[in-house]
């Protein structure tokens, strides 16, 4: 019995096992709907757990959902959950959804229906490792993680392989052909995908073992053509990994320090899915961000959002975000510009903005304090002059009471020495002639370049301002010295506090500038009322930046701005060093703008002017212009300064007037004069100190400061203390070389009524210099527009010429009774009226007549008619009679006579023989007032037509007037070399004012006066010719003879204050114009003429001068009977003296 029951139990158990694990007989016949049927051995696995009806029902609900999913054509991954049951279905892109629904899904569904659901139940097929062919279904009652794990494995073409029990099903799967495969679409339900990091030199498919099409489906946002090593790539479905960092807790961005060779792309993959666009956006406000295309090593790159980080500092940066430590975001001294790289300066490299591809700070040029200072247009109400006087020996020695180019309001003594204990060395000063000066304020200057930079003395200034004790001692000593000698102030010339690079001495401490300010405040507080405190300041930003200049200006009374020595031989070996001028106009203006940018008030500044030049020795003697190389030792010296590299004004003048001068020119780059001398040296100096003085005045400066008075040409003076006790001054010498133009000025300007001969001549010289300069500029402007000038000249010449020709026509034919002829009322006959042969027997006349209407009737025959013969021309059967009288010859030929009814065509053929020209000239002048010359007549080979006063004239093979002779182009022989020569003469005269006798300067300007007449003629030609050309057809007014008389306006301006009679001016204008036209002039005769014009002035103004004395003064008395001539005759006399030498007198 027991055995029987045991048998039944075992039988039923075996049958149960078969029912559970062998299901092949339960699978329906496969239906694949025209897709490929593939029989497969499908793995079925499970993990045991208690089964519940609830879980079973929830699982069956999931199957219903899956069935709905599979009704569609697309999709690979399908997820659903119900209660605590989680389900996932993977149907590869080549697996047919409907076939899967009908053939594979029922296997799982039947298992659940029949046996319920344990912990885990799944079936899978790995597709041979191809996720496009694999499929699987899984249900789990405990965790979503299990189905997620299966999803990731199946999407790689791998098996789950996680089971406690398993079996296999024989089933048929339906596959789509590759051409009709489903699109691979990523599914993010699994969360973050499983990924790999791409290795260099490998493809994603090779490295992962997964086909590229599946990988691209799982990574839809990746461009597989632009992958780089390190890129994370999803090898399963799911979200890509996210390594993008969050910003820091303080709100700043997370940064990454760029290594050499890295790019935005290589960095982005480390923080995937950080994109290039993300990097660009995060770094828009990051300092120095120039974009991914210009990524820099060690750059602090933002890899998250947030505020920009502090950039990597540059240990030598001075300002802005790149400056290190306490300098971070520091401002520049003098309010200078902070460049994008963190350096201070005032040139375009620091101050200009520029275009930026990113717009980030630090990429668009200047970072802060951008732009330039400006120059004031407020002219100074008061303008004073300072001169530094050197207490020198030998040829530099100069009497301080007799300084040229004065007077000076303030005289600075250069220099008083300071002892190492800060006491004042007055051993030389106490005996100096400087103390006897009474015409100027006297101020001692302490320091100077040599004292400030000499290894034996450079520490004195530094130590004197370093401590309170030293500052107090030094200040008291200065005050006591000033009071002892009853001086007007104190001037300090420390060159320069805080200077880091002066040769042969250690760099100064950066605190010296603030120490200097503290000392100046102390000193000013101790000074008595009415005494001034001043300092010298450099025009170089490099040295001025150490001066707390804004505070200093509020402490001192004035500052001397050293706008000279900007360039020199000390630049040897430095970048961009070459032959240059030490006072370049543009750089001086930039230095002025630097003061403005620093907040300095110009009315506390005296602009520096120099009366010396800096010289260079050339590397190549053929290259001596601005920009050429130079040697270390400097240009050749002379015995006044006795220093290579520098020449005084006096030395330059001596070289310029000697055969040591090789060449001389004005350099437009610097507005300086350059001169080659000795064959191997070149020196440059300011073109005009007066122009610089005017510039400082116009910019609102307090005045100018000259370095140095001793450099002017002066009398030899023995600076001997024992001889300085004689206060006796020489009586005034009117011809003294130190004649002072400033003594001639009143408040209104030039004083023409001053009885001093030199003053009147100096005034004339200044007027010539002024107008001569204007004339040079006028001619240069015209030459720059020369093509139009020629057009205007031709138009003006035509107008003048027509006017003269009208007078000539009337004189030749009408007024003096020469042949007149006209058409009769009907226009049939040409009637000739014979002249009175007795009136002008020196003129031969021939006539030719014609009717234009003859041409219209095809009457083309040319017929010569002999004496007393009548020829009939037939017109429409009518005879046209033409008569001839007095045995003259008549030519018939085609011409321009208008049709019948017109009574105004005159045709001339008149010749004035050479033997008769003088008589013709006299007759024409008596008739018209116009004076001709023999060259004024010309015989034309071709017809010349004129429309004059409503009549039409044709001169055929006639003597007419020569327009070129009457109205020459005065600029024909004027070129740049000639203008350069005139400019040099003006500059030579300008530089010689106060140094040379006015008589000598006056002679230099003779050619300039003639050039002024040329300029006036050219200007009149350009201006009036332009008007005539523009309105030529409307202009019919008669014009007086001669464009030459156009210079009267200019000479009237030149001589108007003197009051010369207009008739004299007019004739003198002709005098100068003739010389200008011919390009030749005898200078001494022109001087004679000029003096003649001034004589009436001298006579009326000078009580101590007579005509003869004035003539003697300038050596022009060339005629014993000169004083007996009237003014007009005097000019005629000068005219007769014109010679044939070059106009410039050289």
From Swiss-Prot:
Keywords: Carbohydrate metabolism, Chitin degradation, Chitin-binding, Cleavage on pair of basic residues, Disulfide bond, Glycoprotein, Glycosidase, Hydrolase, Plasmid, Polysaccharide degradation, Repeat, Signal, Toxin. Residues 316-372 form the Chitin-binding type-1 domain. Glycans are attached at residues 771, 858, 868, 876, 1117. The keyword Acyltransferase does not apply. RF2 is potentially split by membrane-bound basic amino acid-specific peptidase to yield the alpha and beta subunits. SUPFAM superfamilies: (Trans)glycosidases, Chitinase insertion domain, LysM domain, Plant lectins/antimicrobial peptides. Residues 1-17 form the signal peptide. Residues 383-735 form the GH18 domain. The active site is at 495 (proton donor). Residues 205-234, 254-303 form the LysM domain. Disulfide bonds join 319-338, 332-344, 337-351, 366-370. GO terms for molecular function: chitin binding; endochitinase activity; toxin activity. The killer toxin is composed of three subunits: alpha, beta and gamma. This is Killer toxin subunits alpha/beta.
């Amino acid at each position: 019995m027991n055995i029987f029951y045991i048998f039944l139990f075992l039988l039923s158990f075996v049958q149960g096992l078969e029912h559970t694990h062998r299901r092949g007989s339960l699978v329906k016949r496969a239906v694949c709907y025209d897709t490929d049927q593939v029989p497969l051995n499908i793995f079925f696995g499970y993990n045991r757990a208690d089964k519940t009806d609830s879980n079973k029902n929830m699982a069956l609900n999931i199957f219903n959902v899956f069935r709905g999913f599979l009704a569609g054509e697309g999709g690979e991954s399908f997820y659903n959950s119900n209660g605590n049951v989680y389900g996932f279905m993977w149907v590869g892109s080549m697996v047919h959804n409907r076939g899967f629904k009908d053939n594979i899904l029922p296997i799982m569904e039947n298992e659940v229906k029949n046996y319920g659901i344990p912990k885990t139940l799944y079936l899978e097929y790995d597709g041979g490792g191809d996720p496009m062919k694999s499929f699987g279904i899984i249900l789990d009652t405990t965790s979503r993680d299990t189905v997620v794990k299966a999803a990731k494995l199946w999407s790689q073409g791998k098996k789950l392989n996680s089971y406690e029990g398993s079996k296999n099903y024989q089933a048929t799967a339906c596959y789509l052909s590759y051409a009709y495969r489903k699109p691979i679409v990523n599914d993010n339900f699994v969360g973050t995908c499983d990924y790999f990091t791409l290795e260099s030199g490998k493809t994603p498919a090779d490295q992962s073992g997964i086909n590229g099409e599946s990988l691209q489906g799982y990574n839809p946002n990746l461009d597989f053509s632009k992958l780089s090593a390190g890129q994370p790539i999803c090898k399963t479905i799911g979200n890509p990994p996210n390594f993008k960092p969050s910003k820091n807790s303080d709100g700043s961005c997370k940064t990454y320090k760029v290594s050499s060779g890295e790019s935005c792309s290589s960095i982005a993959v480390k923080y995937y899915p950080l994109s290039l666009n993300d990097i660009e956006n995060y770094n828009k406000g990051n300092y120095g961000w120039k974009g991914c295309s210009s990524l820099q090593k060690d750059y602090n790159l933002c890899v998250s959002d947030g505020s920009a980080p502090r950039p990597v500092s540059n240990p030598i940066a001075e300002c802005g975000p790149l400056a290190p430590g306490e300098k971070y975001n520091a401002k520049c001294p003098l309010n200078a510009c902070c460049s994008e790289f963190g350096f201070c300066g005032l040139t375009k490299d620091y101050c200009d903005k520029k275009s930026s591809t990113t717009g980030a700070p630090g990429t668009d040029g200047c970072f802060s304090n951008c732009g330039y200072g400006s120059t004031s247009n407020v002219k100074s109400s008061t303008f004073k002059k300072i001169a530094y006087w050197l207490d020198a020996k030998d040829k530099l020695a100069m009497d301080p009471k007799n300084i040229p180019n004065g007077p000076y309001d303030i005289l600075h003594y250069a220099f008083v020495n300071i002892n190492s204990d800060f006491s004042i060395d007055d051993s030389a000063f106490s005996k100096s002639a400087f103390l006897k000066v009474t015409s100027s304020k006297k101020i001692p200057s302490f320091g100077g370049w040599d004292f400030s930079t000499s290894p034996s003395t450079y520490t004195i200034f530094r130590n004197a301002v370093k401590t309170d004790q030293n500052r107090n001692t030094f200040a008291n000593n200065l005050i006591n010295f000033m009071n002892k000698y009853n001086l007007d102030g104190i001037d300090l010339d420390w060159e320069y506090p805080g200077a880091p690079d002066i040769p042969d001495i250690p760099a100064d401490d950066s605190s010296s500038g603030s120490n200097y300010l503290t000392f100046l405040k102390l000193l000013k507080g101790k000074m008595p009322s009415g005494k001034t405190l001043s300092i010298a300041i450099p025009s170089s930003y490099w040295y001025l930046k150490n001066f707390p200049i804004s505070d200093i200006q509020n402490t001192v009374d004035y500052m001397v701005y050293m706008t000279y020595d900007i360039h020199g031989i000390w630049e040897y070996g430095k970048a961009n060093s070459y032959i240059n001028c030490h006072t370049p106009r543009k750089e001086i203006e930039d230095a002025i703008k630097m003061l403005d940018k620093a907040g300095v008030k110009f009315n506390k500044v005296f602009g520096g002017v120099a009366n010396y030049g800096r010289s260079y020795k050339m590397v190549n003697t053929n290259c001596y212009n601005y920009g050429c190389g130079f040697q270390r030792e400097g240009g050749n010296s002379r015995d006044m300064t006795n220093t290579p590299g520098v020449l005084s004004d006096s030395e330059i003048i001596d070289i310029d007037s000697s055969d040591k001068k090789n060449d001389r020119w004005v350099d437009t780059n610097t507005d300086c004069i350059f001169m080659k001398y000795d064959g191997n040296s070149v020196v440059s100096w300011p073109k005009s100190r007066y122009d610089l003085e005017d510039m400082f005045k116009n910019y609102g400066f307090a005045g100018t400061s000259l370095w140095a008075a001793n450099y002017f040409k002066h009398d030899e003076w023995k600076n001997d203390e024992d001889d300085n006790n004689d206060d006796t001054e020489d009586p005034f010498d009117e011809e003294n070389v130190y004649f002072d133009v400033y003594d001639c000025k009143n408040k209104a300007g030039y004083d023409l009524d001053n009885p001093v001969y030199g003053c009147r001549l100096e005034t004339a010289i200044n007027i010539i210099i002024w107008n001569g300069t204007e004339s040079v500029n006028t001619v240069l402007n015209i030459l720059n527009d020369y093509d139009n000038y020629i057009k205007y000249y031709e138009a003006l010449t035509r107008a003048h010429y027509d006017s003269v020709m009208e007078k000539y026509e009337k004189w030749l034919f009408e007024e003096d009774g020469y042949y007149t002829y006209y058409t009769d009322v009907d226009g049939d006959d040409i009637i000739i009226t014979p002249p009175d042969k007795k009136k002008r027997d020196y003129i031969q006349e021939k006539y030719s007549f014609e009717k234009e209407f003859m041409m219209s009737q095809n009457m083309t025959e040319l017929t010569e008619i002999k004496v007393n013969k009548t020829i009939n021309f037939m017109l429409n059967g009518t005879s046209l009679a033409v008569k001839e009288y007095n045995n003259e010859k008549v030519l018939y030929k085609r011409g321009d006579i208008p049709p019948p009814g017109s009574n105004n065509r005159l045709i001339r053929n008149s010749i004035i023989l050479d033997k008769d020209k003088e008589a013709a000239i006299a007759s024409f002048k008596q008739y018209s007032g116009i004076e001709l010359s023999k060259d004024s007549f010309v015989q034309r080979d071709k017809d010349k037509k004129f429309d004059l006063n409503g009549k039409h004239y044709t001169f055929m093979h006639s003597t007419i007037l020569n327009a070129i002779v009457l109205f020459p182009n005065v600029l024909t022989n004027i070129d740049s070399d000639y203008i350069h020569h005139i400019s040099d003469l003006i500059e030579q005269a300008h530089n010689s004012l106060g140094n040379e006798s006015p008589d000598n300067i006056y002679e230099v300007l003779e050619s300039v006066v003639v050039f002024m007449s040329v300029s006036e003629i050219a200007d009149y030609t350009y201006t009036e010719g332009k008007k005539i050309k523009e309105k030529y057809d409307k202009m019919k007014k008669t014009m007086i003879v001669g464009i030459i008389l156009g210079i009267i306006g200019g000479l009237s301006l030149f001589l108007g204050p003197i009051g010369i009679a207009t008739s004299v001016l007019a004739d003198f204008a002709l005098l100068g114009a003739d010389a200008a036209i011919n390009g030749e002039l005898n200078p001494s005769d022109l001087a004679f003429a000029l003096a003649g014009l001034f004589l009436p002035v001298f006579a009326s103004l000078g009580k101590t001068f007579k005509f003869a004395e004035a003539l003697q003064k300038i050596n022009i008395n060339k005629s014993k009977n000169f004083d007996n001539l009237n003014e007009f005759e005097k000019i005629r006399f000068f005219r007769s003296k014109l010679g044939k030498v070059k106009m410039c007198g050289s």
